[in-house]
C-alpha cells in the first residue's frame, strides 16, 4: 500500500471514530433513539423471522442458527448471532430490535419502533420469491400498508407517540438482489439462457426504482439501500462456480459490480425526481470483499469456508444440528453459512453503514 493509501485509510478510520463519537453523544443527551423507528425490507440478509411461520423451506429457526444470539436460541436470523441491522438499531440507540411483522410479538408498543418485513429468498424479481414461496417485495409493501393502518391507533393510545412522525422520520432499509442472482438467475436456465446478467440487472433495477417510489408515496423519506455483496466470494458460490484470482469468482463479482453501478445511478435519479427524498446507497461490496480476501487483517482466520458444516455449501435446512464439521468459534470466520456473514463480520459491516448513513439521521 502506498503512502497516500495509508493516509486515506487513516482518514477513514478517524472519520469513522468522529462520526461514532457524535452519535454516542447524541444518544446520551437525548436518552432516546436518534430516529423514531426502523423499517426493514428485503431478503435473508435482514430477515429476522418472517419466514418462520410461512410455507417455505428457506428457514433458519433451528440450531445451530442463533447459537450466539443474545438469547442463544434460533430466531429465524440467517446467522449465528446478530445481523448488521441489529447492530444498526443498537448504534441508533434502540434497546430492542424491530420485530418480524408476521411474528406474534409484532403488536402494541413493539410496533412503535418500526417493523421488519424482510423474507429470506425474496428479491427485486418477483419470480425469485415465488420460486421459494417467500414474501415478495410487493407483498412486503402490502404488509407495510397494514402496519400504517395499525400504527395510527397504537400511537393514539400512547400519548408520546406521533404516527406521522414515525412514518416520515423513520429510517427505511432495503436489502435485496443477492437471492435474485444466487438462488435464481445462475441456476435457472429459463433465465440465464434468455437474458444476459446485464439484462437481468436492468429488470431488477426497474423493480428497485418502483419499490422506492412506492415507499416514497406512502410517506418514507429516509431510505438506505444496500448494494450487492461480492457474490463471487460467497463460499457456496465458490463451491459451485469455482474460485479465480484472489480466491473469488471474478465473473460473479463483475455481475455484482455492474448491478451496483446501475443501483447508484438510479438512486441519484430518484433523489433528483422525488422532492425531499434522502436516499443513501450503502456499499456492502467493498467491506465484505476486503473481509473475504484479507481476513487476517480484520482478525479472522477463515474466509473461504463457512462455519456451519463443511463450510462449502450449507445454508438453511442444510445447516442443521446434524451438520458435520460446524466450527466451535464463529468469531474466527467471515461467513456463518454458505451465503451469510457471521455476527463478527456483521459488526464490521454495520460500522461501515454507520459512517455512510450519517446523513439519514442528521
From Swiss-Prot:
Coiled coil: none
Enzyme Commission identifier(s): 3.1.1.-
Primary location class: secreted
GO molecular function, one term: hydrolase activity, acting on ester bonds
One Gene Ontology biological process: lipid catabolic process
InterPro entries tied to this protein: GDSL (IPR001087), GDSL_lipolytic_enzyme (IPR050592), SGNH_hydro_sf (IPR036514), SGNH_plant_lipase-like (IPR035669)
Subcellular location(s) per record: Secreted
Record: active site: 44 (nucleophile), 337, 340
Pfam family, one: Lipase_GDSL
Position of the signal peptide: 1-28
GO terms for cellular component: extracellular region
Glycosylated sites: 159, 162, 264, 329
CDD domains from the UniProt entry: SGNH_plant_lipase_like
Key words, A-Z: Glycoprotein, Hydrolase, Lipid degradation, Lipid metabolism, Secreted, Signal
Protein family: Belongs to the 'GDSL' lipolytic enzyme family.
Record protein name field: GDSL esterase/lipase At5g22810
Lineage: Eukaryota, Viridiplantae, Streptophyta, Embryophyta, Tracheophyta
Amino acid at each position: 500500500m502506498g503512502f497516500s493509501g495509508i493516509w486515506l485509510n487513516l482518514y477513514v478510520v478517524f472519520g469513522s471514530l468522529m462520526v461514532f463519537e457524535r452519535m454516542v453523544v447524541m444518544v446520551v443527551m437525548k436518552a432516546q433513539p436518534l430516529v423514531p423507528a426502523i423499517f426493514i425490507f428485503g431478503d435473508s440478509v435482514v430477515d429476522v423471522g418472517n419466514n418462520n411461520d410461512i410455507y417455505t423451506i428457506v428457514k433458519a429457526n433451528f440450531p445451530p442458527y442463533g447459537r450466539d444470539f443474545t438469547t442463544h436460541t434460533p430466531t429465524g436470523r440467517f446467522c449465528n448471532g446478530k445481523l448488521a441491522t441489529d447492530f444498526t438499531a443498537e448504534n441508533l440507540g434502540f434497546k430492542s430490535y424491530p420485530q418480524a411483522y408476521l411474528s406474534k410479538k409484532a403488536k402494541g408498543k413493539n410496533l412503535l419502533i418500526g417493523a421488519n418485513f424482510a423474507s429470506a429468498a425474496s428479491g427485486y424479481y418477483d419470480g425469485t420469491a415465488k420460486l421459494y414461496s417467500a414474501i415478495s417485495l410487493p407483498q412486503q409493501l402490502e404488509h407495510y400498508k397494514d402496519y400504517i393502518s395499525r400504527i395510527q391507533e397504537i400511537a393514539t393510545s400512547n400519548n408520546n407517540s406521533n404516527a406521522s412522525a414515525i412514518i416520515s422520520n423513520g429510517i427505511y432499509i432495503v436489502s435485496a438482489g443477492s437471492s435474485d442472482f444466487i438462488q435464481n438467475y445462475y441456476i435457472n436456465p429459463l433465465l440465464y439462457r434468455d437474458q444476459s446478467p446485464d439484462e437481468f440487472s436492468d429488470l431488477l433495477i426497474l423493480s428497485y426504482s418502483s419499490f422506492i417510489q412506492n415507499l416514497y408515496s406512502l410517506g418514507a423519506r429516509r431510505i438506505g439501500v444496500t448494494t450487492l455483496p461480492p457474490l463471487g466470494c460467497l463460499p457456496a458460490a465458490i463451491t459451485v462456480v469455482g474460485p479465480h484470482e484472489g480466491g473469488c469468482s471474478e465473473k460473479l463479482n463483475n455481475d455484482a459490480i455492474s448491478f451496483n453501478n446501475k443501483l447508484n445511478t438510479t438512486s441519484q435519479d430518484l433523489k433528483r425526481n422525488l422532492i425531499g427524498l434522502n436516499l443513501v446507497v450503502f456499499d456492502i461490496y467493498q467491506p465484505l470483499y476486503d473481509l473475504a480476501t484479507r481476513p487476517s487483517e480484520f482478525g479472522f482466520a477463515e474466509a473461504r469456508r463457512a462455519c456451519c458444516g463443511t463450510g462449502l455449501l450449507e445454508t438453511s435446512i442444510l445447516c442443521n444440528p446434524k451438520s458435520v464439521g460446524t466450527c466451535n468459534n464463529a468469531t474466527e470466520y467471515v461467513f456463518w453459512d454458505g451465503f451469510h456473514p457471521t455476527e463478527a463480520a456483521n459488526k464490521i459491516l454495520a460500522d461501515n453503514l454507520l459512517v455512510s448513513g450519517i446523513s439519514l439521521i442528521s
